[in-house]
Structure formats: structure tokens, C-alpha cells
Amino acid sequence: MRLMWIMLFAALGLAAQTKMPNLALNCPAEASSVENQNLLPEFAVDGKTKTRWSSAHRDDPQWFKVDLGAVKTVGRVVILWENSAALDYKIQLSSDGENWIDAIHKNDGKGGEENLSFSPQPARFVRFTGQFRIQQ
């Protein structure tokens, strides 16, 4: 997966969405793999659109996880993709980093900017799990 960067937002009304803080900004991040040392997981949450995380070129699934540091209510995820993207992926939430629930399962990913809203839920950890890529 070539995730460019990811933003997580608290659940607020639509009018406030543009002013909502990015809950993932500079939070600790981990991933199943990295393509190289210039594409580390923390670059996906540094707020810079010129940096990104990219998984190693190997079999899927691949995952990327953010630790928000405390339980927060999450209701929206924005993903900005590089050239490659995931066709089939899940956004999963967890309060303990062990037990996950699916907030979204998308099987028609298109790349570009994907703005994903879902029923607001409490979570400390947010995980992207890419099942299949659009481009290899």
C-alpha cells in the first residue's frame, strides 16, 4: 500500500468538520512493513503532504496503526493516496490495541483523496488494513 497520509477526526457536526483537529497528527504510528527508511509510518501522520508511509512490495494484507494516546471519539478518516492505493480495505478501531471492530470496509477504493465518515465510536487505536491493491 502506498498510503500518503492519514487524518483522523473527532465526531462533530458537519458545519464544524473543516475546523476539526486532526487527532492523528504526530501520534505514534506502526505498520506491518515499510518500503524503505524514507517512507516510515510516522510520515503518514506528520501533517506534511510531501511525506508518506509505504509498505514493502510483498503480499497483502498490509496494515498501518495509529495510537491516539487516549480513548477519543472518532467518526471520520481522510486518506490521501500516492499513485498506488488499496481497492479493498478496512478502517478498524480499538480501545486496547488487541480487540478490533470494523468502522468501515471499503471494497471499491479509487485512490486520490478518500473522505470516510462513519458512526462515531470511542477508540485509542485506529488501524488501516489493506486487503488488495489497485496497482502493484
Locations of regions flagged by a protein language model:
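Positively charged n-region of N-terminal signal peptides that target proteins for export
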Residues: 1-4
